Amino acid sequence: MKIVIADDHHVVRKGLRFFFATQDDIEVVGEAATGLEALRVIEETKPDLVLMDLSMPEMDGIQAIKKAIQQFPDTNIIVLTSYSDQEHVIPALQAGAKAYQLKDTEPEELVKTRQVHGGEYKLSTAIMPHVLTHMKNQHDPEKEKYYQLTRREKDVLTEIANGKSNKEIAAALFISEKTVKTHVSNLLAKLEVADRTQAALFAVKYNLNGEISK
């Protein structure tokens, strides 16, 4: 898996590069110190994942995410930042980030964010209250779609919002991975959302059964 690291701090970039060097299936193919440089490196290296800080010169991370998604729609971007406030979290997710992690995240959790490359979705538990508050404050014409889901589809949706992979959902619900995939496909269609990221945000909006990680 090819990764690009975009952060304006040299020490952070080198630290991440050193850490990922210990992972057999991860290769750091580029680094960037500014938002503009990140776009150039993404174009040159076509990485599977991009670790993006939000505070960078020339172009901040949020603008860089927007432009990267516009120019390279298949790009999977993981925000790695020290900001946990709503003013940064929500715009970053709306810009197209597939994961949002804080810089004090445990290394093992950071490695798990690679799952966004396979369609998974990862949010730091520290930012979930901000996401929930934002979604609750939005006008809600879509609520009826939730009630179209079966009980099992709701269970699967809750697990998606908690950042679990299909394999983990299957184990938690005692069903096969193939059955999980079927439920995911069905609930995406019923909710009229394009991917697991949007489904997870939908789940956070309704705080399903209080089971979503706070």
Curated annotation (Swiss-Prot):
The modification 4-aspartylphosphate is found at residue 53. It comes from Bacillus subtilis (strain 168). This is Uncharacterized transcriptional regulatory protein YhcZ. Member of the two-component regulatory system YhcY/YhcZ. Its main location: cytoplasm. Coiled coil: none annotated. Residues 166-185 bind DNA. The lineage of its organism: Bacteria, Bacillati, Bacillota, Bacilli, Bacillales. It is found in: Cytoplasm. Residues 2-118 form the Response regulatory domain. Phosphorylated by YhcY. One of its GO terms (molecular function) is DNA binding. GO terms for biological process: phosphorelay signal transduction system; regulation of DNA-templated transcription. The keyword DNA-binding applies. Pfam families: GerE (PF00196), Response_reg (PF00072). Residues 142-207 form the HTH luxR-type domain. One of its GO terms (cellular component) is cytoplasm.
